[in-house]
Amino acid sequence: MLILSRKVNEGIVIDDNIHIKVISIDRGSVRLGFEAPESTLILRTELKEAIVSENQKASASVDESLLENIKKVIKP
């Protein structure tokens, strides 16, 4: 992991097309601004983790009887 120190109004550039700028620092909270192509997905970590968790729950809740019926229909 690369760790950088930046002050307000300073920034970093990733791959020449993603710009991240420190907008403000206030009582333990940092506001960041992002400039990136529209095709670049930018998510907060907690949102990404929630999506992964929901996807895992959805895939784990497969009805076993449904799978057995599918196996009966599709025979090798």
Curated annotation (Swiss-Prot):
What are the record keywords, sorted? Bacterial flagellum biogenesis, Cytoplasm, Repressor, RNA-binding, Translation regulation
Write down the Pfam families for this protein, in alphabetical order. CsrA
What's any one GO cellular component for it? cytosol
Question: Can you say where in the cell this protein is located?
Answer: Cytoplasm
Source domain of life: Bacteria
Query: How does this chain assemble?
Result: Homodimer; the beta-strands of each monomer intercalate to form a hydrophobic core, while the alpha-helices form wings that extend away from the core.
Q: Which PANTHER family match?
A: CARBON STORAGE REGULATOR
Say which family it is in: Belongs to the CsrA/RsmA family.
Q: What is the protein named?
A: Translational regulator CsrA
Query: What is the organism field in this record?
Result: Helicobacter pylori (strain J99 / ATCC 700824) (Campylobacter pylori J99)
What is the taxonomic lineage of the source species?
Bacteria, Pseudomonadati, Campylobacterota, Epsilonproteobacteria, Campylobacterales
